[in-house]
């Protein structure tokens, strides 16, 4: 792995000159294809949890960006659509049926998954878009018209509801993508962006918009936090009243309750939100 990282880092330093050196370009393309294949298999990932902290593997981001620089667009076709892109689809009309059967993946018409994306076992992909570098763990549902941004990390047994936007990020290199940990529910038409971390077991109601500067308020105490939804929190949209009379209030996300793991597993999402 160290030699692979070294090669990517060296190529990154001369990225503006790569297209002018055909011999280096040929060697680099093979390396980049290996990185994309490893992303597809989940052998490497853009961001991973180490000792309770999420860390970005910047070299993987660099490899993806180099892949864009060194790859020419081409025409792709399937049975009902065609498109012109630098990134191939993860699944094509030639994909062996056994790949889906062995992994128990269900992918319906209209679902777009770019290569360089990891899709684990028992994932259901409705008509949606999943970008390069994303990681979708076991048993998760990506519902209709959801968008999973580049490098976004989605945990096990999550439900990403219809029309939801999960932000991704390739640049700046050190920035974290959005991270949705295990057993989370993200309500329909919500948007989680700008590197926000939704910790394990959290429930986000329909229509909640959270970015890095969004005020996240504990309803009981009034405490305000940013960029993180604590584990097993239940969150709804709200408005923070203006301090001055007659001034408009500002949007916020409100933590209305926190439950333990046992309660979360036994109580329905609808009951939690009520």
From Swiss-Prot:
Per the record, its GO cellular-component terms are: cytoplasm
Q: What is this protein called?
A: 2,3,4,5-tetrahydropyridine-2,6-dicarboxylate N-succinyltransferase
What GO molecular function terms would the record report? 2,3,4,5-tetrahydropyridine-2,6-dicarboxylate N-succinyltransferase activity
What catalytic reaction does the record list? (S)-2,3,4,5-tetrahydrodipicolinate + succinyl-CoA + H2O = (S)-2-succinylamino-6-oxoheptanedioate + CoA
Class of enzymatic activity (EC top level): transferase
Task: Tell me the residue numbers annotated for binding substrate.
Answer: 106, 143
Q: What is its EC number?
A: 2.3.1.117
